[in-house]
Amino acid sequence: MSVNSPVRPVMAADILARKGGEPLVCLTAYTTPMARLVDAHCDITLVGDSLGMVVHGLPTTLGVTMEMMILHGKAVARGTSRAMLVIDMPFGSYEESPAQAFANARRLMAETGCAAVKLEGGRHMAGTIRFLVERGIPVMAHVGLTPQAVNALGGYKVQGRGADADRVMEDAIAVAEAGAFSVVLEKVPDGLSQRITQRVAIPTIGIGASAHCDGQVLVLDDMLGLFTDFRPKFVKRYGELGTAADEAIAAYAAEVRARRFPASEHVFPDELKGKQP
């Protein structure tokens, strides 16, 4: 391969092959500049419907539309060359029927160039996952806390404690057997997450789950300290970009009001020194 050959992007088969190996690294991204940063370090870039909350200021993910996912999906695709690009299917775009799910998944892939879609739900979505996979659409599943079902679940609660553990385990087994290439475990207790990881043949990707999952995912704006409306227990802040941005904007505003910006090096003289071009 020559030095100028394009980098082969990560694909579903590559993710499957990582089961039980080095942990998979996944982050969300919503813009081209951030996608470039994520692409340099991660195996999977997820255009999550969390964009509704962290980018558009919505109270939940329920108001996210296909058009929003496509807009941000295109932007992230422009900044992604190596990582596997996965896009969330928004609420209402896949639950009605497998045919509806296929039509919208096909649209996401065709218009953004993503490599896979992600959808929420366990046993009740297994038939839809199988329908998509049989028609050439790789699917990342999502069980445990499924934010699109927040109203039915009674809030953003941990899923799978006590007698509820069997339900979450059965959901994970069902989506794996349906052909999903990986499954996100969200807000699932540590021990149960480990048992699911040992039980299913596909990689588990934890968010508020266990360090023993096959990979981890976080919302980029959470881990960078950009989204500060609330902070889930499972989020570790690896930066405080929100604070840094606030300080930078405050400094800019102060300099403008004091007429210290723009300074001489930021403006153009009336005449050029020396020979005219």
Curated annotation (Swiss-Prot):
<keyword id="KW-0479">Metal-binding</keyword>
<dbReference type="InterPro" id="IPR003700">
    <property type="entry name" value="Pantoate_hydroxy_MeTrfase"/>
</dbReference>
<feature type="binding site">
    <location>
        <position position="49"/>
    </location>
    <ligand>
        <name>Mg(2+)</name>
    </ligand>
</feature>
<comment type="function">
    <text>Catalyzes the reversible reaction in which hydroxymethyl group from 5,10-methylenetetrahydrofolate is transferred onto alpha-ketoisovalerate to form ketopantoate.</text>
</comment>
<feature type="binding site">
    <location>
        <position position="120"/>
    </location>
    <ligand>
        <name>Mg(2+)</name>
    </ligand>
</feature>
<keyword id="KW-0566">Pantothenate biosynthesis</keyword>
<keyword id="KW-0963">Cytoplasm</keyword>
<feature type="binding site">
    <location>
        <position position="88"/>
    </location>
    <ligand>
        <name>3-methyl-2-oxobutanoate</name>
    </ligand>
</feature>
<comment type="similarity">
    <text>Belongs to the PanB family.</text>
</comment>
<feature type="binding site">
    <location>
        <position position="88"/>
    </location>
    <ligand>
        <name>Mg(2+)</name>
    </ligand>
</feature>
<dbReference type="InterPro" id="IPR040442">
    <property type="entry name" value="Pyrv_kinase-like_dom_sf"/>
</dbReference>
<comment type="subunit">
    <text>Homodecamer; pentamer of dimers.</text>
</comment>
<dbReference type="GO" id="GO:0005737">
    <property type="term" value="C:cytoplasm"/>
</dbReference>
<dbReference type="Pfam" id="PF02548">
    <property type="entry name" value="Pantoate_transf"/>
</dbReference>
<dbReference type="GO" id="GO:0000287">
    <property type="term" value="F:magnesium ion binding"/>
</dbReference>
<feature type="active site" description="Proton acceptor">
    <location>
        <position position="186"/>
    </location>
</feature>
<dbReference type="GO" id="GO:0015940">
    <property type="term" value="P:pantothenate biosynthetic process"/>
</dbReference>
<feature type="binding site">
    <location>
        <begin position="49"/>
        <end position="50"/>
    </location>
    <ligand>
        <name>3-methyl-2-oxobutanoate</name>
    </ligand>
</feature>
<keyword id="KW-0808">Transferase</keyword>
<dbReference type="GO" id="GO:0003864">
    <property type="term" value="F:3-methyl-2-oxobutanoate hydroxymethyltransferase activity"/>
</dbReference>
<protein>
    <recommendedName>
        <fullName>3-methyl-2-oxobutanoate hydroxymethyltransferase</fullName>
        <ecNumber>2.1.2.11</ecNumber>
    </recommendedName>
</protein>
<keyword id="KW-0460">Magnesium</keyword>
<dbReference type="InterPro" id="IPR015813">
    <property type="entry name" value="Pyrv/PenolPyrv_kinase-like_dom"/>
</dbReference>
<feature type="binding site">
    <location>
        <position position="118"/>
    </location>
    <ligand>
        <name>3-methyl-2-oxobutanoate</name>
    </ligand>
</feature>
<comment type="pathway">
    <text>Cofactor biosynthesis; (R)-pantothenate biosynthesis; (R)-pantoate from 3-methyl-2-oxobutanoate: step 1/2.</text>
</comment>
